[in-house]
């Protein structure tokens, strides 16, 4: 199986004016309702599992159409209503001035005592963060497009040229540490791409191993290290590399329920961010490993780890890894027969297999045999 760059499927162009217009349209609506003597309100798409579904056609986890209405003249709603307007004004200022703020900065910048009262606008960041998520769903824009960022996590390494503001550089010439993916990647451009595909790797240790073994150069790929669950910035970057630049996406995680869920969020989206699946998920992604089949295929029985928790057939079970496996067995997006088989084998054997277990063969085994062989022969899970 030869992986190669394909024709781009979409072209993204960040336009701050569109974000400003959506903010202003919503603000004008509230103002007109107040001026006409009506009770101003926001319609907020409802969060939670009961408003999430798996869309078979798009192959994405999506948010349903349930709404909750938040009124100004309602004692139960008034505080959140005020907080929403405060953050809308703050975001408008950020976007207009071309500045960015972290979630923490957004909280502190807008925390103050309401004049004439002893009431604070925000008591804790746990109040401001959900309002920003509400605005994402109400406006249909990413938090990052509103110039609100989170801590950066993850890095990339490979022969692509990145344009970040006034800076332009090749991600294979920044040392073995690569380029750290920022919290927002909306402004990033890719003037030159000289790789055939993207290999997304769960652990930094495995990504470092592949870089040391010259895998990106030899296999002509871009390494994306997620360093655990992929951040929004990393997921958005993967999405853009596939849809805008036509690069196939291959994911490589530990063979356990958490590694498989990392793959699931990259491919299908997540329950918590179902409203952003269309912009963050990449349903064409494929999974190379680790799998339960790898244990037998590569004689790794002696380097497996026991699943954590209590099995379903024991008193108090299932808990831990076992509980997570059963949840995944029941998710609509894990119903493919190959995935069902992998999950059931993990339950039956009661083991997990880490990426680093391949070092039992040799340090270079993963880069020179395991990955090239599986990708070349198309041994990939959907």
Swiss-Prot record:
List, separated by semicolons, the cofactors it needs.
Mg(2+)
For this entry, list what GO says about its biological process: DNA topological change
Q: What is its EC number?
A: 5.6.2.2
| Binding-site residues for Mg(2+), renumbered to this chain | 202, 254
Parts forming coiled coils: none
Name the UniProt key words of this record, in alphabetical order.
Answer: ATP-binding, DNA-binding, Isomerase, Magnesium, Metal-binding, Nucleotide-binding, Topoisomerase
The record's listing under Pfam families reads: TOP6A-Spo11_Toprim (PF21180), Topo_VI_alpha (PF20768), TP6A_N (PF04406)
One GO cellular component this record assigns the protein to is: chromosome
Q: Where is the Topo IIA-type catalytic domain?
A: 14-155
The record's active-site residues are 108
- Matching Gene3D superfamilies, A to Z? 3.40.1360.10, Winged helix-like DNA-binding domain superfamily/Winged helix DNA-binding domain (1.10.10.10)
| InterPro entries recorded | Spo11/TopoVI_A (IPR002815), Spo11/TopoVI_A_N (IPR013049), Spo11/TopoVI_A_sf (IPR036078), Topo_VI_alpha (IPR049333), TopoVI_A (IPR004085), TOPRIM_Topo6A/Spo11 (IPR034136), WH-like_DNA-bd_sf (IPR036388)
The reaction(s) annotated as catalysed by this protein in its Swiss-Prot or TrEMBL entry are: ATP-dependent breakage, passage and rejoining of double-stranded DNA
| GO-annotated molecular function | ATP binding; DNA binding; DNA topoisomerase type II (double strand cut, ATP-hydrolyzing) activity; magnesium ion binding
Subunit and interaction comment: Homodimer. Heterotetramer of two Top6A and two Top6B chains.
Cited function: Relaxes both positive and negative superturns and exhibits a strong decatenase activity.
Stated family: Belongs to the TOP6A family.
PANTHER family reported in the protein's UniProt record: MEIOTIC RECOMBINATION PROTEIN SPO11
| Name by which UniProt lists this protein | Type 2 DNA topoisomerase 6 subunit A
In which organism is this protein found?
Pyrococcus horikoshii (strain ATCC 700860 / DSM 12428 / JCM 9974 / NBRC 100139 / OT-3)
What gene makes this protein? top6A
């Amino acid at each position: 199986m030869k992986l190669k760059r394909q024709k781009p499927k979409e072209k993204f162009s960040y336009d701050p004016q569109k974000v400003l217009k959506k903010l202003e349209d919503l603000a004008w609506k509230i103002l007109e309702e107040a001026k006409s003597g009506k009770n101003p309100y926001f319609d907020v798409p409802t969060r939670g599992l009961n408003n999430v579904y798996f869309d078979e056609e798009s192959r994405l986890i999506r948010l349903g159409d349930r709404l909750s209405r938040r009124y100004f003249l309602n004692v139960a709603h008034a505080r959140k209503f005020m907080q929403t307007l405060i953050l809308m004004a703050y975001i408008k200022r950020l976007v207009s001035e071309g500045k960015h703020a972290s979630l923490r900065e957004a909280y502190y910048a807008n925390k103050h005592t309401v004049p004439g009262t002893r009431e604070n606008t925000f008591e804790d960041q746990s109040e401001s963060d959900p309002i920003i998520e509400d605005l994402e769903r109400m406006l249909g824009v990413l938090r990052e497009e509103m110039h609100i960022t989170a801590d950066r996590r993850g890095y990339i390494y490979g022969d692509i040229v990145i344009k970040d503001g006034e800076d332009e550089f090749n991600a294979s010439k920044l040392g073995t540490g690569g380029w750290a993916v920022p919290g927002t990647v909306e402004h990033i451009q890719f003037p030159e791409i000289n790789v055939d595909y993207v290999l997304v790797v769960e652990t930094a240790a495995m990504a470092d191993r592949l870089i040391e073994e010259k895998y990106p150069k030899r296999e002509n790929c871009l390494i994306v290290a997620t360093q655990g669950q992929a951040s929004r910035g990393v997921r958005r970057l993967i999405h853009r590399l596939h849809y805008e630049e036509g690069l196939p996406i291959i994911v490589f995680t530990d063979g356990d329920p958490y590694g498989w869920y990392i793959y699931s969020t990259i491919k299908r989206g997540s329950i918590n961010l179902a409203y952003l699946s269309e912009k963050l998920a990449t349903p064409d992604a494929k999974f190379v490993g680790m799998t339960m089949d790898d244990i037998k295929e590569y004689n790794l029985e002696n380097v497996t780890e026991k699943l954590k928790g209590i099995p379903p057939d024991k008193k108090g079970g299932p808990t831990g890894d076992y509980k997570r496996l059963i949840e995944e067995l029941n998710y609509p997006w894990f119903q493919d027969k190959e995935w069902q088989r992998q999950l059931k084998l993990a339950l039956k054997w009661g083991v997990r297999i880490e990426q680093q277990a391949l070092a039992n063969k040799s340090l270079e085994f993963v880069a020179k045999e395991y990955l090239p062989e599986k990708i070349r022969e198309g041994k990939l899970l959907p």
